[in-house]
Amino acid sequence: MEALSSLTFKGSLPEAIFEAKGKKKLFVVYISGEDEESDKLNRLTWTDASVADSLSKYCILVHIQAGSVDATNFSAIYPYSSVPCIAAIGFSGTQVWRTEGFITAEDLASSLEKAWLGLHIQETTASIFSAALASQNSETPVSSASSVVLPPGSVPLDAAVASPSTASSVQPSETKSTVTSASTTENNDGTVAVKGKESAEPSNLCDTTKNQPAPSVDGTKANVEHEATETPLRVQAEKEPIRPTAPGTNDNTSRVRSSVDRKRKQGTVINEEDSGVGVSGRDINLTKSVDTKETMKPKDEGGEEEDGEKSKKASDVHLNIRLPDGSSLQEKFSVTSILRMVKDYVNSNQTIGLGAYDLAVPYPRKVYTDQDLDKSLSELRLFDRQALVVVPRKRATVYQRGTSYSESNNNTDPNSGGYFAYVRRVLSYANPFSYFGGGTANASSSVPERQTRPNTEVRNNLGQVGTSFQDPSEGRSNVRNRRPTTSRIGSNIHTLNHNEDEAPFGDGNAFWNGNSTQYGGGSGGDSNDRR
């Protein structure tokens, strides 16, 4: 355990994850228990120098005890069936390798190196092809190589084909019987041997290559650099149309395709002869990327259909019509329908007995008149969902009480209308009995311009009006009925001790004007009497 503790990361799980991402290393999780195989791993495998060297170069190791909270959380994301369990997680969070049970030190070191190299080759190839495809203005012609669909959670084939000594595992986590391809090597005679192995355990994601020596790290890195420099030339060659003068390429492509299909179905070992032209995983990636573009076209067509549905919906207008009693009518009309159709719908569906009315928009307030009935809803700017209110038309009302006296005076003497209005304004400053309307129609003296201060001539006219207003044709009842108009005129004179039982111009009724001067109240009813 002392050797294992020296290899593990000193820190929390989040810190270990950030460390692995920052240094581009594999995040390796070792879950152990109290069983015999876990103890054997601790004594024999983790103490080996090759394992320690591989971990220091390629991995960040975290040790978790089985049954702990961290082990439960890990199993929820990356399920495992037994302990001890060793799992390698890539940069993007995908599980690239896992083994359960005892494993030798040589196999563990080789598997970790191959997983790290395959992950880096995949990342380098993907970045180069992404840059190459982004620079293309036109769509790249699709080669005759068929696209190979990889199961979820597996390593792409470019990690196995691009590197001669790289082993890749292809196995879905859900199937009972899976096939893993391992130890894909290129012999001197140009033969590609693809060895398939059928595993009885669904959790075994790695086929250890015991017979194959572990490749050197320096040689593999040089191979990666060579593949990176060779990639732009391949991209340019793939842009050119395929000519029938290279039958070896087509034969090789069909052979690889048939071998992959047969390997999945039967799990048998197939040895095929290569004509000297190898098909790398980059061809498969290119085909997959082009297929992705083609699969996106139906989505665009679906988007156009959705736009057509939206435009179809925009051609309908949903109206919510509010009636005066608080009820509502809801109906859908076309934008080409005229407003008269809406009004006919209201007439046929209302039950409150509406009279003459108009339709209006509540905000901003706009009332549609009879001239708008022949206009379409689109011309009236009614789209989508709109609210309308029913506005009843107001009936004209005649108030006879307020107009009977003045109209009779105007009809009696049409020339006295302006004079009466002017005198009435002047009397509002000095006369508390300004409700006498046209009582000055028989006055013959002309009135000068408006005066802001009362004068003796106006006061004399007041006395004459008070004594001469006895014409039975105009009626005394109208004089008494117009008493409330005094407050409506707004005079600034306050009367004192007014009694309606007395004569309107009786003696002893004193009043004040706006200049604190008291008039009236004398024995003879003289309005010129000042106090």
Curated annotation (Swiss-Prot):
Region Disordered, annotated ranges: 160-316, 441-531
KW S-adenosyl-L-methionine (keyword) present: no
Basic and acidic residues composition bias: residue spans: 290-301
Modified residues (N-acetylmethionine): M1
UniProt cross-references to SMART domains, sorted A to Z: UBX
Keyword vocabulary terms for this entry: Acetylation, Ubl conjugation pathway
Domain (UBX) ranges: 312-390
Biased composition regions of type Polar residues, renumbered to the chain: 174-190, 201-214, 441-478, 486-496
Bias (Low complexity): 160-173
Alphabetical list of Pfam families matching this protein: UBX
Transmembrane regions listed in the UniProt entry: none
InterPro entries: Thioredoxin-like_sf, Ubiquitin-like_domsf, UBX_dom
Subunit record text: Interacts with CDC48A.
Name this protein carries in UniProt: Plant UBX domain-containing protein 11
Species, as recorded: Arabidopsis thaliana (Mouse-ear cress)
